[in-house]
């Protein structure tokens, strides 16, 4: 088994030809684009040939040209191998939030599965259909701050081949949404799926060029039984194809580039779509010493995105004040000063004063409403009940104040649970004075669609909280404490726009020992939402989420601090 680009063995990752064999190949082409005024050059893979449509019949193999406007979520991964300012194309990827890119794990690891230094030497290029930006330096390039692997990537088996990159700045291009956990409709055998990429336009290892423009390819999905029989036989490795972790597609390689339809080296990390959702990531396929792809009778393998959705979704929406993957706390005393307390996992760092005055607000919760990687605040003004979105941008650390709702003085609860209707944008919930649970679907820019009544009877709950997924199914949930009994209830998310929550079920009894529940998100960084609770004596506790929607929903509490009764607002 080998990384695509080194023709050894019969199982190959679909990396760009030449990238993994730097010691064997030399030189680079001169197509460049500039970013951040640092003088970087963006180039196709070292030693790789590039062909333009005027010199070829456009194809991945059997594909067609596509414009950036029809695939605005498509990005390129670049890597600086020699600390010389030259960043070479390695893989494709998908923008799944303004500051998040989904790709293949083998695109951000070496041949042994060791993570590459994508933070120090990697970059993402977006906004162009041209390979490495083309001769006119098209596109926008941004750095990378974090890499996340959903599952344990197995380099030998090319298993769990999915990664998520966090960008240093948000991009303004339209993101795509991954297929949800449990989605079966989009994976039916025979369904026609569309794949994108800049990969090789022929199957010959030595003479086939990469495309200089983005291409698309339609292929029928195959059943797991077909995939296992076809691919295990093709690579002579029983169990090479792993149902549940992988899918496969294709008409069956023809061995002839004029009649074949296949993904090839250079297409790695790029998305496969069905009905507007990313269902797969180009991963691997059979190869020989002479043929890089389109092997007679064989299919192409892709990572099954829906399987990993519940792991990657908490990382797509993991914005915090410290800009790591752990949720922090915001609090203020009876004065005007706000403070942030950054999570260190199972403890909180010393508080830091947060710019601005907050004495005018009687409710403050945190969220990233526009998914730009900078934490926002939702704050209700005491005197008027008006609700404001306090947000900053990549170009300014000053928080702007935007009114988003008026006259919410009698609203019982305001919640920012994240995306509840499965459209990729963080929403706002409100419990009215009469107990109606209202969902305000967000456009992601401080504006909202018409409110939807999701439930009634919520006046019986004295606290309504939620941020993220407490049941590890990829859907955001709510926690409710009932007045009188102080029992804790869970309302599981459904991901449906008309009925986004199930009927609440009791998960804990008599929580009267706590006078405040806070749901900032994933505090300890394990991709499961947690709960922070303040006791009546002022002690603050972390209750780590377990992902179970039962009485075992939280692990044993861990004390975070004392004296928290001095804080007026915690969010």
Residue ranges and their predicted role:
Residues 2-97, 102, 116, 292-295, ...:
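Protease-domain processing segments flanking chymotrypsin-fold serine proteases, especially trypsin-like
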Residues 32-39, 95-108, 210, 215-224, ...:
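C-terminal subregion of chymotrypsin/trypsin-like serine protease catalytic domains
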Residues 66-70, 95-96, 116-118, 155-159, ...:
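Extracellular/periplasmic catalytic domains that process cell-envelope and extracellular macromolecules
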Residues 72-76, 90-92, 247, 263, ...:
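Structural detector of coil-to-beta-strand junctions
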Residues 78-80, 101-104, 109-152:
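Conserved H-D interstitial segment of serine endopeptidase catalytic domains
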Residues 80-82, 106-109, 127-132, 168-173, ...:
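Acidic glycine-/aspartate-rich tracts in secreted/extracellular proteins
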Residues 130-133, 141-143, 156-255:
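Chymotrypsin/trypsin-fold serine protease catalytic domain
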Residues 317-571:
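Trp/Gly-enriched beta-strand/coil motifs that build multi-repeat beta-propeller-like domains
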């Amino acid at each position: 088994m080998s990384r695509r680009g080194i023709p050894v063995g019969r199982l190959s990752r679909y990396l760009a030809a030449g990238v993994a064999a730097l010691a064997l190949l030399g030189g680079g082409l001169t197509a460049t684009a500039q970013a951040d005024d640092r003088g970087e050059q963006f180039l196709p893979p070292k030693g790789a040939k590039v062909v333009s449509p005027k010199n070829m019949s456009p194809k991945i193999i059997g594909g067609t040209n596509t414009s950036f406007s029809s695939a605005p979520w498509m990005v390129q991964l670049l890597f600086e191998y020699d600390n010389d300012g030259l960043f070479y194309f390695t893989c494709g990827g998908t923008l799944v939030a303004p500051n998040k890119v989904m790709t293949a794990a083998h695109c951000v690891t070496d041949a042994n599965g060791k993570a590459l230094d994508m933070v120090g030497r990697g970059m993402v290029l977006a906004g162009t259909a041209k390979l490495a930006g083309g001769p006119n330096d098209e596109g926008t390039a941004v750095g990378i701050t974090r890499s996340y692997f959903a599952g344990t990537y197995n380099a030998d088996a090319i298993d769990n081949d999915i990664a998520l990159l966090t960008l240093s700045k948000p991009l303004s291009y339209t993101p795509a949404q991954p297929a949800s956990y449990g989605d079966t409709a989009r994976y039916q055998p025979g369904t026609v799926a569309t794949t994108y990429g800049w990969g090789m336009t022929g199957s010959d290892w030595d003479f086939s060029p990469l495309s200089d423009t983005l291409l698309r390819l339609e292929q029928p999905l195959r059943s797991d039984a077909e995939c296992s029989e076809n691919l295990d036989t093709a690579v002579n490795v029983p169990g090479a194809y792993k149902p549940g972790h992988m899918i496969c597609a294709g008409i069956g390689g023809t061995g002839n580039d004029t009649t074949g339809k296949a993904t090839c080296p250079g297409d790695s990390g790029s998305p496969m779509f069905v009905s507007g959702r990313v269902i797969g990531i180009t991963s691997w396929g059979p190869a020989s010493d002479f043929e890089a792809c389109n092997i007679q009778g064989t299919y192409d393998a892709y990572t099954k995105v829906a399987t990993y959705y519940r792991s990657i979704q908490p990382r797509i929406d993991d914005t915090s004040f410290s800009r790591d993957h752990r949720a922090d706390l915001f609090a203020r005393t009876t004065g005007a000063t706000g403070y942030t307390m950054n999570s260190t996992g199972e403890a909180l760092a010393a508080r830091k004063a947060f710019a601005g005055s907050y004495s005018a607000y009687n409710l403050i919760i945190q969220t990233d409403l526009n998914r730009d990687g900078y934490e926002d605040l939702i704050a209700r003004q005491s005197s008027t009940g008006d609700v404001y979105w306090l947000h900053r941008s990549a170009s300014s650390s000053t928080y702007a104040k935007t009114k988003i709702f008026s006259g919410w003085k009698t609203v019982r609860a305001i919640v920012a649970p994240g995306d509840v209707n499965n459209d990729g944008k963080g929403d706002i919930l409100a419990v009215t004075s009469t107990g109606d649970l209202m969902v305000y679907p967000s456009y992601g820019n401080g504006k909202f669609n018409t409110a939807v009544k999701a439930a009634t009877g919520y006046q019986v709950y004295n606290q309504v909280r939620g941020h993220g997924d407490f049941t590890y199914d990829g859907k955001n949930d709510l926690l409710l404490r009932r007045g009188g009994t102080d029992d804790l209830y869970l309302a599981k998310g459904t991901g449906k726009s008309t009925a986004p929550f199930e009927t609440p079920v009791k998960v804990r009894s008599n929580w009267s020992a706590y006078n405040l529940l806070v749901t900032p998100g994933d505090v300890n960084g394990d991709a499961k939402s947690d709960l922070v609770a303040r006791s009546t004596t002022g002690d603050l506790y972390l209750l780590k989420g377990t992902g179970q929607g039962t009485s075992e929903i939280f692990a044993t509490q861990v004390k975070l601090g004392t004296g928290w009764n001095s804080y007026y607002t915690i969010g």
